[in-house]
């Protein structure tokens, strides 16, 4: 008789949890630090950016590459790593499996669309990414609408930037999405003829429309 077990998801720390944790260890943290490097608490064992990056890269290699490659017996390791990196650096963006395949096939000539779809499923099953659909009053229509991908932690994006040009806007949107999940909201996207709202969050029969912006200096951002 096989043993019984209960599976539950453990997420990186929310911003509130990071503040509480840093208070306990007498360590200062700024909001921007969290927007860039996220909520894995063990990173605070390191005092400089380079050491923090090395730790997070090692963590990523262990969780994403080593574990998943072994678990799913992935043969096309180079292609898998390129696809994973492409996905993680494009968090908080509209995507489809076809668009990912189109962008990656120049680097991986022998990769098929079905393989890209499989790799996406592996990342979702491992809780590395979340995929959320566009809101629709008709459930069947969700299949034809676009989706967005959000990373379990924004550090997976920041590890891939060049010249310290961190993707603050998309990371901030990613953090808001994760915070909504922590708080128990059901989250979807909304786009009606180009009138986009980042999130429709529902909980206890209440609906909240949420637009995320790092700055509203841009007129289009302000109008939205």
Predicted features and spans:
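Conserved beta3 VAIK motif of the Hanks protein kinase fold
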Residues: 210
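Accessory nucleic acid-recognition modules appended to NTPase machines
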Residues: 48-207
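A generic structural signal for short hydrophobic patches within well-formed alpha-helices
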Residues: 15-18, 156-157
């Amino acid at each position: 008789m096989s043993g019984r077990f209960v599976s539950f998801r453990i997420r990186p720390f929310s911003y509130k949890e990071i503040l509480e944790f840093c208070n306990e260890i007498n360590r200062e943290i700024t909001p921007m630090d969290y927007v860039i490097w996220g909520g894995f608490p063990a990173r605070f064992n390191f005092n400089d950016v380079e050491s923090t990056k090395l730790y997070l890269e090692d963590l990523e290699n262990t969780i994403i590459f080593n574990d998943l490659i072994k678990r799913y017996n992935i043969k096309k390791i180079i292609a898998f790593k390129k696809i994973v990196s492409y996905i993680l650096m494009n968090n908080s963006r509209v995507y489809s499996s076809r668009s990912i395949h189109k962008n990656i096939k120049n680097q991986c000539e022998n990769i098929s669309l079905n393989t890209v779809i499989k790799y996406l499923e592996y990342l979702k099953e491992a809780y590395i990414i979340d995929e959320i659909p566009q809101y629709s009053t008709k459930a069947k229509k969700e299949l034809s609408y676009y989706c967005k991908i959000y990373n379990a932690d924004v550090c997976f994006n920041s590890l891939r930037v060049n010249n310290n040009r961190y993707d603050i806007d998309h990371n901030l949107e990613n953090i808001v999405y994760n915070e909504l999940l922590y708080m128990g909201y059901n989250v979807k996207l909304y786009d009606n003829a180009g009138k986009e709202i980042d999130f429709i969050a529902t909980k206890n029969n209440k609906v909240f429309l949420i637009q995320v912006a790092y700055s509203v200096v841009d007129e289009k951002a302000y109008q939205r």
